[in-house]
Regions:
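Positively charged n-region of N-terminal signal peptides that target proteins for export
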Residues: 1-6
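Hydrophobic h-region of N-terminal signal peptides that target proteins for export
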Residues: 12-20
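Non-catalytic cap/lid and distal C-terminal segments of serine-dependent acyl enzymes
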Residues: 21-268
């Protein structure tokens, strides 16, 4: 009886792999701006063929995580197969916040994400080499990073998502190493004012970016996300804002990322 259950479990596992046969690869991408290799996880669909061009979804991880975090539960790979796109997850460092840091010249993660990584993917994979075929999203620090890079590089990205993102960092001057990247808020207030998402909406041309924001109602970033939503409404910037019961955790994000992929792929 035990052996039969074991064989059944193995068969079910094989069926799962057969149904979702995406390919996952870890690559080193050289950053001239930072003079180092950056680890990047690339997932291609089972149907990947160099004769076809594929849209790309870039996914940025949160504080203290790395390029592998989004792959741990298999959801992203299944979405890649479902929508026939590529997913790219760069290592954003322990706490880069995806800035080109004004106080730490060796931290140039904006340049890496919005320039060097794009160039690498477009030259090494069969991608849609146009902003309309690129989306970027992320969770927490990565949600901030996605919005930050997309707003500042609307010529590069056509769609942006934000999952529980730190879209206003000013209420959190002592948290998550932000002051290491911008300097303290007391000594460098301008760095904090101009590098927080809620103060960057004037850079948006209405309709220039497809924007999808998602944050749980029990999240400590919920209030700042609601404030950004209200400001975008006031400035008549089209966007989708989703608010559901949930917290700042992977249970929420693993569900929310499915809707982000649907949002992006409807617009590719």
């Amino acid at each position: 009886m035990v052996m039969k259950k074991f064989i059944l479990a193995q068969c079910l596992m094989l069926l799962c792999f057969a149904a979702s046969a995406f390919q996952q690869k870890e690559v080193n991408v050289w950053s001239s701006a930072m003079n180092k290799d950056v680890l990047v996880t690339v997932i291609t669909p089972d149907s990947y063929n160099a004769s076809q061009s594929y849209p790309v979804v870039y996914i940025l991880h949160g504080f203290s995580d790395n390029h592998l975090k989004w792959t741990e539960r298999g959801v992203v790979g299944a979405l890649v197969d479902q929508y026939n796109v590529l997913a790219v997850m760069p290592d954003g460092g322990f706490s880069s916040w995806y800035f080109d840091s004004p106080v730490m010249p060796e931290y140039k993660y904006e340049t890496f994400v919005s320039s060097e990584l794009i160039e690498y993917m477009d030259s090494h994979y069969s991608t849609v080499k146009d902003r309309k075929g690129r989306a970027i999203t992320g969770n927490s620090m990565g949600g901030h990073g996605a919005m930050y890079n997309a707003i500042r590089h609307q010529d590069v990205f056509g769609s942006v998502g934000c999952l529980s993102g730190g879209v206003d960092i000013r209420p959190f001057p002592e948290n998550w190493d932000i002051k290491k990247r911008l300097g303290t808020i007391e000594e460098n207030p301008e760095n904090w004012e101009k590098n927080t998402i809620i103060n960057m909406t004037h850079l948006l041309t209405p309709g220039s970016l497809n924007i999808a924001i998602d944050c749980g109602q029990g999240d400590f970033f919920y209030e700042v996300n609601c404030n950004l939503h209200k400001k975008l409404l006031e400035e008549k910037i089209p966007h989708e804002f989703t608010s559901r019961p949930g917290y700042h955790n992977w249970d929420y994000w693993m569900n929310a990322i499915k809707y982000q992929f649907l949002f992006f792929c409807d617009r590719f």
